[in-house]
């Protein structure tokens, strides 16, 4: 059985006072998946999300399941939110990031978002 998963392809965030907006780009735009198989989603930022003051990379991943609000999966690059199964992992550095699902389950279907947290409007 194959399950459809929808991904948000482009997020643009306006940052006042910034010389240019931070643009977040996700690939692929959609991803057919098979239960039990691995899957990964890539995210690229137009600017580094590494905070030189504290060494943290402010990139989060969210999953919005059908009919529900988005739920936090991964925060600050690689930390799983409470209750998130360990089949989810986040990695990357600077401007290139990956969300990996080691073994896809039916409940993983939804819209996945990457979000930068280094600058806010």
UniProtKB/Swiss-Prot annotation:
Disulfide bonds: 43-114
Record region (Framework-1): 21-43
Entry GO terms, CC: blood microparticle; extracellular exosome; extracellular region; immunoglobulin complex; plasma membrane
Domain named Ig-like: residues: 20-121
Entry superkingdom: Eukaryota
Gene3D superfamilies: Immunoglobulins
Framework-2: annotated segments: 61-75
Locations listed in the record: Secreted; Cell membrane
Entry's Gene Ontology BP terms: adaptive immune response; immune response
Matching Pfam families: V-set
Cleavable signal peptide: 1-19
Keywords, comma-separated and alphabetical: Adaptive immunity, Cell membrane, Disulfide bond, Immunity, Immunoglobulin, Immunoglobulin domain, Membrane, Secreted, Signal
Complementarity-determining-3 as annotated region, ranges: 115-121
Predominant location: secreted
Molecular-function annotations in GO: antigen binding
Region (Complementarity-determining-1): 44-60
Spans annotated as Framework-3: 83-114
UniProt xrefs under InterPro entries: Ig-like_dom (IPR007110), Ig-like_dom_sf (IPR036179), Ig-like_fold (IPR013783), Ig_V-set (IPR013106), IgV_Light_Chain (IPR050150)
Assembly behavior: Immunoglobulins are composed of two identical heavy chains and two identical light chains; disulfide-linked.
Function: V region of the variable domain of immunoglobulin light chains that participates in the antigen recognition. Immunoglobulins, also known as antibodies, are membrane-bound or secreted glycoproteins produced by B lymphocytes. In the recognition phase of humoral immunity, the membrane-bound immunoglobulins serve as receptors which, upon binding of a specific antigen, trigger the clonal expansion and differentiation of B lymphocytes into immunoglobulins-secreting plasma cells.
The name this protein goes by in its record: Immunoglobulin kappa variable 2D-40
Gene: IGKV2D-40
